[in-house]
């Protein structure tokens, strides 16, 4: 079997295709979560905390060159080391939301699988088998 045909067999298996579809959907879903975090949740948190833009929350770890604007992008371009905790907070919130949603999906899937795997009611024993068991039991019983 040539390498190309082996690869074709591998690529056409259901698991690989399912994985590819999952990765594509996951990437698209990640963008939705990014939007929810950046456009809906972080502005509300920023409003409560008093800062509207978390991405510009940082601490300079060195003095900037004279005339450098005090924005994160300008300081990074000037080579000033900064501790950008605002961006980190946004990413942490993003991760927590994504992890929670995935947990809820897996939980629902597992419950659905458990429901499908519930044992069926035992089948009714056919009459001929019941009769044979009765005959067997009567033959085993002590005679008086």
From Swiss-Prot:
PROSITE patterns annotated for this entry?
MSCL
Please give one Pfam family short name: MscL
Say which domain of life the source belongs to.
Bacteria
- Localization terms from the record: Cell inner membrane
What membrane topology term does the record carry? Multi-pass membrane protein
Q: Which UniProt keywords apply?
A: Cell inner membrane, Cell membrane, Ion channel, Ion transport, Membrane, Transmembrane, Transmembrane helix, Transport
Q: Where are the transmembrane segments?
A: 16-36, 86-106
Provide the primary localization.
membrane
Q: Which InterPro entries match?
A: Mechanosensitive_channel_CS, MS_channel, MSC/AndL, MscL_channel
| Entry's Gene Ontology molecular function annotations | mechanosensitive monoatomic ion channel activity
Name residues in a coiled coil: none
Would you name any one GO CC term?
A: plasma membrane
Please give the HAMAP family that the UniProt record associates with this protein.
MscL
Q: Subunit notes for this chain? A: Homopentamer.
State the similarity comment.
Belongs to the MscL family.
Question: What task does this protein carry out?
Answer: Channel that opens in response to stretch forces in the membrane lipid bilayer. May participate in the regulation of osmotic pressure changes within the cell.
Protein name as catalogued: Large-conductance mechanosensitive channel
Tell me the name of the encoding gene: mscL
């Amino acid at each position: 079997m040539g390498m190309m045909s082996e690869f074709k067999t591998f690529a056409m298996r259901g698991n690989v295709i399912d994985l590819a579809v999952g990765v594509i959907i996951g990437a698209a879903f990640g963008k939705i979560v990014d939007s929810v975090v950046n456009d809906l949740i972080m502005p509300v948190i920023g409003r409560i905390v008093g800062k509207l833009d978390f991405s510009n929350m940082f601490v300079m770890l060195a003095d900037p060159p004279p005339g450098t604007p005090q924005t994160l992008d300008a300081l990074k371009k000037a080579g000033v080391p900064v501790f950008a905790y605002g961006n980190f907070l946004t990413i942490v919130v993003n991760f927590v939301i994504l992890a929670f949603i995935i947990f809820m999906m897996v939980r629902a899937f597992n419950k659905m699988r458990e429901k499908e795997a519930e044992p069926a009611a035992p089948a009714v024993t056919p009459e001929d088998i019941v009769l044979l068991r009765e005959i067997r039991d009567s033959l085993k019983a002590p005679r008086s």
